[in-house]
Amino acid sequence: LGGSFNNAGGLPRNRLAAIDLNTGVLTNWHAGYPGDGEVRTIVINEDQILVGGSFLNIGNASRTRLAALDPVTGEANSWGPSANNFVFTLAVAGDGTVIAGGSFTQINATGRNRIAAIDPVSGALLPWAPSCNNAVYHIEVAGETLYVGGAFTSISANTRNRLAALSLDANTPVETWNPNANNEVYQIDVADGLVYVAGAFTLIGPTTQITRSRLACLDGITGEPTSWDPTANGLAICVEVQDDKAFVGGTYTQVGGRPRNRIAAVNTLTGKPTVFNPNVNSTVYALEYKSNILYAGGQFTSAGGATRNRLAAIDVNTGSLL
């Protein structure tokens, strides 16, 4: 897990830590990061842990906002591209190419506006160079397509309001996919050919914008919103789809008109919130599902009426805290 913390489980851990999912106990893995920046994104790529953020040192080495760490020792390896501003998101394409998104305008001192492709072995910048006019917050890989969300309104001189589909074969966005959100998109998840998006938007649609309050489900080919319409009354910051449920985190206190404080599960067919209601007391920034357990990270200090400082594990079947 990554963030801006300097302590985990009562032990010193600067911005990165590893926790045993079976026991909930902090492991000995330590990335040796003394800096004041943040870790904003983590991706496992074969035998290395890729991280991005605002840091300038990590894994006992100088690394400028991008690094690859050894999963055993926490040491930085030789992979060390540099970004001149925040890296918010990392993804690995099917051919192994590392895709970075953020607010940067240079990678390895070469112009790349908010999105870039990087060689996974050498760290060299690759020729692919779409140009986004504002920040990229999330990149989701689905087959040969990269779905991109953020604050941008154009990519390579093509109008794309906060959402776009890209291919590594071209610098311009896919022409037929243009959902046209009226405000920022923070996260994307793809399931069964559908693209679930979470953000600050209230209108979305490629031809005629329709009301979708912070959550929407889009056709993966046309970009048209489906009938799925959960309606959150505050920001939806993250979305994680599993089977027939979309788990959503953010700042909201209602979903579908029902009380749901910052975490909810929404039926992917009906768009209605399920009975799952962990009730956390502050913002949720990240959700991860594994083996019927939902892991949540954020600013909260309680969940389900119990003390949980910034991390919680919740049984998705019972709603009980672990």
Show which residues each predicted segment covers.
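Extracytoplasmic surface signature
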Residues: L1-L322
